[in-house]
A protein has these predicted regions:
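Catalytic beta-strand/loop cores that center a nucleophilic Ser/Cys/Thr
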Residues: 724-816, 839
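Positively charged n-region of N-terminal signal peptides that target proteins for export
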Residues: 1-5
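A glycine-rich, often tryptophan-bearing local segment used as a flexible ligand/cofactor-contacting loop or short
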Residues: 673-755
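Active-site rim/loop-helix segments in enzyme catalytic domains that contact anionic ligands
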Residues: 21-148, 171, 178-182
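Long beta-sheet-rich domains in secretory-pathway and surface-associated proteins
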Residues: 366-617, 622-623
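Bacterial N-terminal signal peptides
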Residues: 7-16
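Aromatic-Pro/Gly-enriched surface loop or interdomain linker
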Residues: 590-671, 702-704, 811, 829-842
Length: 843
């Protein structure tokens, strides 16, 4: 039995890597595990700031060992992070990280919630964070989440008493949780949000502490632990064939875009919880001690508990279907209790168990991935009763409207199939993340539908309800309509079904820089999402920009095909920046959307409709040099940005670097974190520095502190120590302290105005110590901190130059910040006032 449990449980976990929509097959061990959860009426809520902040060990322990309903409330969706597996950043990264969180919860058994807070990047303190987030709005979201989820215990990941010692988002999440703990039960607090919920008072609030928060293991061992609970989260689950930490490691490993793939850990391990509010449990190994978590918690629950506790005690692992009659009876009694909260939760759990013990397979799917409002689609229904119990399918409804009303006996292992043709309402919303439907602010998403706030994702467009009769009791079971197809290399795949426009358009470049008056061709690609689509496309642009044509026609025969149209755009003669929007006109509808698909094996494919627009900038910029060699680090879009202002950029494979191989380039640029992630640089650094010594320019962008120190003794030709210094306020004052240096004079004059309009931050991981050969160019600081001069350093080396910069060009250039382009051009141009054009670089 244990071997069977292992196989089935691993299949469930690994299945999330193929498609999160795939129906799960439940072993008797899985069903028994769910019955244990069914018989526990207690709830825990974990609160932190970002995807991957959560302690999956504790979430898994609460869900799988305690059997509590366990949720994770993440303040943000992680939009401000970086992406180690693909190109998605900002809003699109938030969509990906949302799905990775949901994948993690499918593994550890938790549920997922969010507030409307945006991950706007690193913040040094909660004061800044809460100002940008709009504290009252996000506090209201936390209060509402508590009222809806109704946790008995809340666990904070971070300490609310230590502002400035960690990410401001981290501390803010804990501060909001502490405040919301009491406000959730105050009817005068956020009373406008009580329409669909009610006040709630959690019993206990904990801080998930560890030795790390004390500074060292030695200090933690000596600390007063009188207010600490400790639980062994290394427990082994014989029924599942895995330990708690193995499950937790698999859950954490869903955060692939953040590089959280990790090895499993095994063995006993303690987790500590500091009581912040509420009474101290007598048993310091039980968060729920003294809280009624049995069926007697709800009026009328004693009869239900008597039935379900007996099912648990006498569970038949060889034939779980023998419990069907008792489970149906418990379901029937459950419908009569007055506590709507527990009725809804436990009815959902109980229906899933009934479906599993009866061997029922119910699904509704389409064989097309998407369609349009007003179009017809076919929904395929399948129902199989794989037991000898009498089960009747009485009817099937789609979104509440009955579409099949012919009672059918589901005979043992006989497949029932039916096709339903339905029409998508013309008023149907397009598929997409609800939090991106409207333009938000720097710190918050704009969501007008209050019922959606907190949900991890937008509910899918179609839901099929199978109305069944089991043991004489009517039981409705809902199934989301999915898209199902097969691939020879992957087999059966389930993905979400999408509703999309008839056509969308895409501007090839999101930022278009005009460095002079020369017109540029603007490609616009139209993609059809139905057969035989024709219409026109127009571009909208600001004043003083001239288009060669107001609109152009297109015609596309096949769904999924594309057609590219070319417009010519002439910039104004003076510096200017504006937006450029493409609009598709079809059948009286104007569509200014680009369809972005996010597809990875470990999460369901996501369709996001983003504004089809670009930023166009007329920039009076000068440059010297033509050919740039770029050594990619962790990944950035700087090369594409440099090509926008006329440079030819060649990506260099570090393995190909040899003596003299770099001499054909006018400058060598190393991408972000190159010395952290490109091990070959350890052996190629001599050639890079020799290139500078012989007259070249080497530009090194930021690397994180600590990692390279033991690997590279000569990241620079002179002494240079990288710190964790950073300036997170993108609007902080910048002083030019080396006013005569070429970096701020040639070929573009740099003034404080060139630091206007920067995004997210000034920079990060600035050096704090350097030799006298280096000249610091800029001075800046965050509020309340000492000024730092290490953001941009330049040193002559032999006949050339070495530049180290922690300025966030990897963010500013793709965002089209004019001053960032001018400054980077100066960096590339240094020492080239008498440049002799180098021979054409091949490739």
């Amino acid at each position: 039995m244990r071997r069977i449990a292992i196989v089935f449980f691993l299949c469930i976990l690994l299945g999330t890597h193929l498609s999160a929509q795939t129906p799960k097959n439940h072993s008797p061990a899985d069903i028994y595990h769910e019955i244990q959860k069914l018989n526990f009426l207690g709830t825990a809520l974990y609160i932190a700031a970002h995807p991957d902040d959560e302690n999956t060990r504790l979430i898994s322990y609460l869900s799988n060992n305690v059997h509590a309903r366990t949720g994770y409330l993440s303040m943000t969706r992680g939009d401000g992070g970086q992406n180690l597996i693909g190109p998605e950043l900002r809003e699109l990264l938030g969509v990906l990280r949302t799905q990775e969180l949901l994948a993690a919860r499918r593994v550890d058994g938790g549920e997922q919630m969010f507030t409307r807070a945006v991950d706007f990047g690193y913040s040094k303190n909660p004061k800044e964070t809460l100002e940008i987030w709009d504290k009252d709005m996000i506090l209201g979201d936390v209060v509402t989440a508590i009222r809806k989820f109704k946790p008995d215990v809340i666990v904070n990941r971070f300490d609310h008493r230590s502002p400035g010692t960690t990410h401001g988002h981290h501390t803010s999440s804990a501060m909001l949780s502490v405040e919301a703990f009491d406000l959730a039960n105050d009817p005068t607090a956020f009373s406008d949000r009580l329409e669909n919920t009610e006040t709630w008072q959690p019993k206990r609030l904990f801080f998930n502490t560890s030795w790390w928060f004390y500074g060292s293991q030695e200090k933690f061992e000596k600390a007063d632990k009188s207010r600490l609970l400790n639980v062994d989260i290394g427990t082994y689950y014989p029924m599942l064939g895995m330990s708690n930490n193995e499950i937790a490691s698999l859950a954490s490993s869903q955060h692939l875009c953040q590089g959280f793939g990790r090895l499993s850990s095994r063995g006993s391990e303690e987790e500590y919880l500091e009581l912040l509010k509420g009474n101290m449990p007598k048993n310091k190994e039980n968060l729920f001690e003294g809280i009624n978590t049995t069926w007697t918690r709800v009026e009328g629950g004693d009869k239900i508990g008597a039935i379900l506790n007996k099912v648990e005690a006498d569970f038949n692992f060889k034939d779980p279907s023998v419990h069907l009659a008792d489970l149906v009876k418990a379901y029937q009694l459950l419908q009569d209790i007055g506590d709507e909260h527990w009725k809804e939760l436990k009815s959902k759990e109980l229906k899933a168990i009934i479906e599993e013990v009866a061997g029922l397979h119910l699904e509704a799917f389409t064989t097309q991935g998407y369609s349009n409002p007003g179009e017809s689609i076919v929904i395929n229904l399948e129902a199989v009763n794989r037991s000898n119990k009498k089960i009747k399918l009485e009817s099937v409804s789609i979104n509440g409207e009955t579409k099949l009303n012919e009672p059918i006996d589901l005979k043992d292992n006989q497949l029932f199939r039916k096709e339903l043709k339905i029409t998508i309402p013309k008023s149907a919303d397009y598929t997409g993340p609800y939090w991106l439907m409207e333009k938000g602010t720097l710190g918050t998403y704009s969501v007008t539908n209050m019922d959606l706030i907190g949900k991890p994702e937008t509910p899918r467009a179609f839901k099929a309800t199978f109305n069944l009769n089991l043991e004489g009791v009517s039981i409705p079971i809902d199934k989301t309509v999915s898209y199902k197809y097969g691939r020879p290399d992957k087999g059966e795949i389930y993905q979400p079904f999408e509703i999309v426009p008839k056509a969308t358009s895409k501007l090839q470049d999101k930022v278009i820089i005009f460095s002079d008056d020369t017109p540029k061709q603007i490609p616009v690609t139209i993609k059809s999402h139905k057969d035989n689509v024709s219409g026109s496309v127009s571009l909208k642009v600001g004043q003083n920009w001239i288009l060669d044509s107001p609109s152009q026609s297109f015609s596309i025969e096949k769904k999924g095909d594309e057609q590219t149209l070319i417009f010519t755009l002439t910039p104004p003669s003076s510096e200017n920046e504006t937006s450029l929007t493409s609009v598709v006109h079809i059948d009286g509808e104007d569509i200014s959307k680009e369809m972005v698909t996010i597809a990875y094996d470990h999460v369901p494919t996501q369709t996001v409709l983003m504004p089809s627009e670009a930023k166009v900038v007329r920039l009076n910029i000068h440059k010297a040099g033509e050919n740039i060699g770029y050594i990619m680090g962790a990944g950035d879009d700087v090369p594409t940005s440099l090509e926008q202002i006329g440079y030819t950029v060649h990506t260099i494979n570090p393995a190909d670097i040899s003596e003299g191989s770099l001499q054909k380039y006018d400058a060598i640029v190393l991408g972000i974190r190159a010395y952290n992630v490109v091990n070959e640089l350890n052996f190629k650094q001599k050639y890079i520095l020799d290139y500078a010594k012989q007259g070249g320019t080497v530009i090194v962008q930021y690397n994180t502190a600590g990692r390279w120190a033991n690997q590279f003794e000569n990241i620079a030709p002179y002494e240079l120590e990288i710190s964790r210094d950073r300036v997170t306020n993108e609007n902080s004052e910048v002083k030019i302290i080396a006013k005569d240096n070429d970096l701020v004079n040639y070929p573009n004059k740099i003034t404080p105005d060139d630091f206007q309009g920067w995004v997210q931050e000034r920079g990060l991981y600035f050096p704090d110590k350097w030799s006298s050969e280096f000249t610091p160019i800029l001075e800046m600081q965050d509020e309340g901190e000492s000024a730092t001069k290490g953001s941009l350093l330049v040193a002559p080396y032999g006949e050339g130059h070495y530049i180290y910069t922690g300025l966030s060009f990897f963010r500013e250039l793709p965002a089209g910040v004019p001053g960032a382009y001018k400054l980077f051009s100066n960096m590339l141009s240094i020492g080239k006032d008498n440049l002799t054009k180098k021979e054409q670089v091949k490739g």
